[in-house]
């Protein structure tokens, strides 16, 4: 995925998702244009 920033962290941008996918260990997210930014802290 595309890198994105979320609360000062670098995360992964997921296109057209309303929430972070399970199984990746994400514990922080930010709403993004047409998707979501998911971060593993």
From Swiss-Prot:
Residues spanning the membrane: none
Role, per record: Remarkably non-selective toxin, with activity on many different ion channels. Weakly and reversibly inhibits rat and human homomeric ASIC1 (isoform ASIC1a) (IC(50)=4.8 uM, and IC(50)=14.6 uM), and ASIC3 (IC(50)=15.9 uM). Molecular modeling interaction with ASIC1a suggests that this peptide hinders the collapse of acidic pockets and stabilizes nonconducting channels state. It activates several potassium channels including Kv1.1/KCNA1, Kv1.2/KCNA2, and drosophila Shaker IR.
Protein name, UniProt field: Pi-stichotoxin-Hcr5b
UniProt entry keywords in alphabetical sequence: Calcium channel impairing toxin, Disulfide bond, Ion channel impairing toxin, Nematocyst, Neurotoxin, Potassium channel impairing toxin, Proton-gated sodium channel impairing toxin, Secreted, Toxin, Voltage-gated calcium channel impairing toxin, Voltage-gated potassium channel impairing toxin, Voltage-gated sodium channel impairing toxin
Disulfide links within the chain: 4-37, 6-30, 20-38
Record GO terms (molecular function): calcium channel regulator activity; ion channel inhibitor activity; potassium channel regulator activity; sodium channel regulator activity; toxin activity
Remarks, miscellaneous: A synonymy between H.magnifica and R.crispa is controversial.
Coiled coil segments of this chain: none
GO CC field: extracellular region; nematocyst
Family of this protein: Belongs to the sea anemone type 3 (BDS) potassium channel toxin family.
Subcellular location(s) per record: Secreted; Nematocyst
């Amino acid at each position: 995925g595309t890198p994105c920033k979320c609360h000062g962290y670098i995360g992964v941008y997921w296109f057209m998702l309303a929430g972070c996918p399970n199984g990746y260990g994400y514990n922080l997210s930010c709403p993004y244009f047409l998707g979501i930014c998911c971060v593993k802290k």
